[in-house]
């Protein structure tokens, strides 16, 4: 739901426990949009952003820079990852953010960026594909602040986090000078009052001349958060600008997240989705109506129920193992969903074993057992499978497994099953 930075910041502000922060990360189900789309949305709400244009070819980059009619330009690779400036491309070309001074430079840099993968600390070694660049005018900043809006899970209310120290790693600010971080809790029934917007603006450290526009920007950012079903609005930096005739305050970098559950009423926003930026297995899982998040371990997990899935991963860790994924097949575990889940798990070449943990309430364990046996045969599974089944029709389920001739280690209890799957991966 939130970026790692925001979750860490909330935790340091005493709003979320570490456990809740991890759970929120593992349940990430939101849309992120490219920077040029974020700027488009901000402008629709009357919020200042540096003038700029996206480009999808080197020739378009040349024309975009020409249209801006200045030698003070920035070109940014459009990839949904942090740390673009410190990243590098799969060709060895350095940095996803470059200062440029001419249309020809824009074209030359775009050639290096477009249709290549940008690799940062957040992407892993594969990187993220770059199919667009964003060319913007450089602005002269007088002061940089930080502002984010998100839901506080503790109070169940929207919360604004503000700091007069922006344009840097906000986590470091929270550690070094926690008093520099201000929090404002908003009653959803009342909304953001003009007075609170002014209080937030005042906390950002802008000059008196810029206070009114800053308060208006805060109000409009909150409108975006509420009207567009956002899960996160993060502006870093929110800048006071010098020598600009149109705006004293500008969002010079923005990050948004939008709630997937509201996609049906945010069709325009969701038309901006870039599937090339998402993990293909997670995209496939969504089509299957499975909740899947890839992790870094070697034990594939298939479980029904998010809470049981979290507990299963905990038990694996407690026994010295490392989960390769979070996979909740929900209350509709069927032979088909079992097979789809196995396909997702086995697409990860790091998986050395599969752990199936099913509690049969609505779900019948004999159906699950049939699915396990069919999936193991059809997919020619070569890694060990450990299955812990409990609940409705469990005896019939165990009987199906035992008579199948397929090598599946069947258990009644969770802890012995977890120990077995860890043992199998270690041997």
Swiss-Prot record:
Catalysed reactions, as listed in the record: succinate + ATP + CoA = succinyl-CoA + ADP + phosphate
Needed cofactors: Mg(2+)
GO molecular function: ATP binding; magnesium ion binding; succinate-CoA ligase (ADP-forming) activity
Top-level EC class as recorded in UniProt: ligase
Subcellular location: Mitochondrion
Keyword list, A-Z: ATP-binding, Ligase, Magnesium, Metal-binding, Mitochondrion, Nucleotide-binding, Phosphoprotein, Transit peptide, Tricarboxylic acid cycle
Annotated disulfide bonds: none
Keyword check for Cell membrane: no
Enzyme Commission code: 6.2.1.5
UniProt GO BP: succinyl-CoA catabolic process; succinyl-CoA metabolic process; tricarboxylic acid cycle
Cofactor remark from the record: Binds 1 Mg(2+) ion per subunit.
Residues reported in the UniProt entry to bind substrate: 304, 361-363
Biological or metabolic pathway of the protein: Carbohydrate metabolism; tricarboxylic acid cycle; succinate from succinyl-CoA (ligase route): step 1/1
Primary site of residence: mitochondrion
Binding site residues for ATP: 76, 83-85, 144
UniProt transit peptide range: 1-30
Occurrences of domain ATP-grasp (ranges): 39-284
GO cellular component: mitochondrion; succinate-CoA ligase complex; succinate-CoA ligase complex (ADP-forming)
Alphabetized PANTHER family for the sequence: SUCCINATE--COA LIGASE [ADP-FORMING] SUBUNIT BETA, MITOCHONDRIAL, SUCCINYL-COA SYNTHETASE BETA CHAIN
Subunit structure: Heterodimer of an alpha and a beta subunit.
Function: Succinyl-CoA synthetase functions in the citric acid cycle (TCA), coupling the hydrolysis of succinyl-CoA to the synthesis of ATP and thus represents the only step of substrate-level phosphorylation in the TCA. The beta subunit provides nucleotide specificity of the enzyme and binds the substrate succinate, while the binding sites for coenzyme A and phosphate are found in the alpha subunit.
Protein name as it appears in the record: Succinate--CoA ligase [ADP-forming] subunit beta, mitochondrial
Organism: Saccharomyces cerevisiae (strain ATCC 204508 / S288c)
Gene responsible for this protein: LSC2
């Amino acid at each position: 739901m939130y970026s790692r930075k925001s979750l860490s910041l909330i935790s340091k502000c005493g709003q979320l426990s570490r456990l809740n922060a991890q759970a929120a990360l593992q349940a990430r189900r939101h849309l992120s949009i490219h920077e040029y789309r974020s700027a488009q949305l901000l402008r629709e709400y009357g919020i200042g952003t540096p003038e700029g244009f996206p480009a999808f070819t080197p020739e378009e980059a040349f024309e975009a820079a020409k249209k801006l009619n200045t030698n003070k330009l920035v070109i940014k690779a459009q990839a949904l990852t942090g740390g673009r400036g410190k990243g590098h491309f799969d060709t060895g070309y350095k940095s996803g953010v470059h200062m440029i001074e001419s249309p020809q430079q824009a074209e030359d840099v775009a050639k290096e960026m477009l249709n290549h993968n940008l690799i940062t600390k957040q992407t892993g070694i594969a990187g993220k594909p770059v199919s667009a660049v964003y060319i913007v005018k450089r602005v002269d900043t007088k002061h940089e602040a930080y502002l984010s809006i998100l839901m506080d899970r503790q109070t169940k209310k929207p919360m604004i986090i503000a700091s007069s120290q922006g344009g840097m790693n906000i986590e470091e600010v929270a550690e070094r000078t926690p008093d520099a971080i201000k929090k404002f809790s908003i009653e959803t029934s009342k909304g953001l009052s003009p007075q609170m917007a002014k209080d937030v603006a005042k906390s950002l450290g802008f000059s008196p001349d810029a206070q009114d526009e800053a308060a208006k920007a805060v109000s409009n950012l909150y409108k975006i958060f509420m009207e567009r079903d956002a899960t996160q609005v993060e502006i870093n930096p929110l800048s006071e600008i010098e020598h600009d005739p149109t705006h004293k305050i500008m969002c010079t970098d923005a990050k948004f997240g939008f709630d997937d559950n509201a996609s049906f009423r945010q069709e325009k926003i969701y038309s901006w989705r870039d599937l090339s930026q998402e993990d293909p297995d997670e995209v496939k899982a969504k089509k299957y109506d499975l909740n899947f998040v890839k992790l870094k371990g070697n034990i594939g997990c298939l479980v029904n129920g998010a809470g049981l899935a979290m507990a299963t991963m905990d038990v694996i860790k407690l026994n010295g193992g490392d989960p390769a994924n979070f996979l909740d097949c929900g209350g509709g575990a069927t032979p088909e969903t079992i097979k789809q889940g196995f396909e997702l798990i086995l697409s990860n070449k790091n998986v050395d074993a599969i752990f199936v943990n099913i509690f049969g309430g609505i779900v019948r364990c004999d159906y699950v057992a049939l699915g396990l046996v069919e999936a193991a045969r059809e997919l020619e599974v070569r890694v060990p499978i450990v299955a812990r089944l409990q609940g409705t029709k469990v005896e019939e389920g165990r009987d199906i497994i035992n008579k199948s001739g397929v090598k599946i280690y069947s258990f009644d209890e969770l802890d012995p099953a977890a120990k077995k799957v860890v043992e199998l991966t270690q041997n």
